[in-house]
Amino acid sequence: MEHVLGFVALAAGLIIGLGAVGACIGIGIMGSKYLEAAARQPELMNELQTKMFLLAGLIDAAFLIGVGIAMMFAFANPFVLK
């Protein structure tokens, strides 16, 4: 029983940590590509900015869904029988 709780805590930490790292890397790469594209074609900057913020929100939403799942495993653990 204690092993299950320990592994669930480890899994929740990994879900949150790796999700945060992935989201940060994704947003960083996307931001650098946006700056490259805006420097190449400044007239498209407003259209690109809208798309960039939309994608940044989607990337963050995927991370927050992972946080929600990790919190469900941590506090309402479906693997422990009561």
From Swiss-Prot:
GO MF annotations, alphabetized: lipid binding; proton-transporting ATP synthase activity, rotational mechanism
Superkingdom, taxonomy of origin: Bacteria
Chief location: membrane
Membrane-topology annotation of the record: Multi-pass membrane protein
Sorted UniProt keywords: ATP synthesis, Cell inner membrane, Cell membrane, CF(0), Hydrogen ion transport, Ion transport, Lipid-binding, Membrane, Transmembrane, Transmembrane helix, Transport
Gene Ontology CC terms: plasma membrane; proton-transporting ATP synthase complex; proton-transporting two-sector ATPase complex, proton-transporting domain
Transmembrane segments: 7-27, 53-73
Keyword Metal-binding: no
Site, as annotated: Reversibly protonated during proton transport: 60
Location within or outside the cell: Cell inner membrane
Subunit field text: F-type ATPases have 2 components, F(1) - the catalytic core - and F(0) - the membrane proton channel. F(1) has five subunits: alpha(3), beta(3), gamma(1), delta(1), epsilon(1). F(0) has three main subunits: a(1), b(2) and c(10-14). The alpha and beta chains form an alternating ring which encloses part of the gamma chain. F(1) is attached to F(0) by a central stalk formed by the gamma and epsilon chains, while a peripheral stalk is formed by the delta and b chains.
HAMAP family per the UniProt record, alphabetical: ATP_synth_c_bact
NCBIfam families: ATP_synt_c, PRK06876.1
The name this protein goes by in its record: ATP synthase subunit c
Naturally occurring in which organism (per UniProt): Polaromonas sp. (strain JS666 / ATCC BAA-500)
Gene behind the chain: atpE
